[in-house]
Amino acid sequence: IDLMSYNQLLRKKSLPRATYVFTDFDRIDFWTRELAAKAYRCLTANNARALNDPASARTRLPMLKKLQGEGLNSFSVWDAEMDGLPDRYPVFLRTRAAHRGTQTELLTTPEEARSALDELVRSGLCLSDLMFVEYCAEPIEDGLFRKLAAYCVGDEVITGMSVHDENWHAKYGKEGVASEAHYLDEMQ
């Protein structure tokens, strides 16, 4: 596997025959995404295998809404700009773009949600980039949380690396908190 940035891809005059997987649309601006979509079309027009069309792939908020609507996700999400405050709690605020993780602790009331949203906007985060996410996770045992990840590549689901943490927000994990049995359980 070779990694190539969009900056590198869009500067190439020719590309080797390969399978190209377009990802991380929440990390690029609109114009780069549009150019990536044109590159995708050039690749497929020349019989190269390309996955995840930048022109039609959903970004975080629309994808989460779709998965929830299809019953695949049990939690809801709300666009802070368009949907207003959540109607279920607890929630947390995060950005739609980038991989910054949560921007707040768990918010349990509309008042806490409004106050946190106002504070993030005052700090310089754009309202149009903020979303509320309903928190539904439960610890796998007392004081231990696990985050799992999976990716679809074509028709194949590939599991990503899991992390374990003592905090509800298990983004990076904490070394030594999970046992070998926890990791073996994931392989079932």
Predicted regions and their residues:
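Conserved N-proximal alpha/beta basic substrate-recognition cap immediately N-terminal to
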Residues: 1-90
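Short, basic/glycine-rich phosphate-binding loops at helix/coil junctions
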Residues: 19-20, 96, 180-181
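Pocket-edge structural micro-motifs
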Residues: 24, 52, 95, 134, ...
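Short catalytic/ligand-binding loop motif for oxyanion handling, primarily in non-cytosolic enzymes
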Residues: 29-30, 59-61, 99-103, 141-142, ...
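Flexible, glycine/proline-enriched loop segments at strand-loop-helix junctions
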Residues: 53-54, 101-107
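Alpha-helix N-cap recognition
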Residues: 81, 109-112
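ATP-grasp fold ATP-binding core
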Residues: 85-103, 125-142
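Phosphate-binding site of ATP-dependent enzymes
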Residues: 111-188
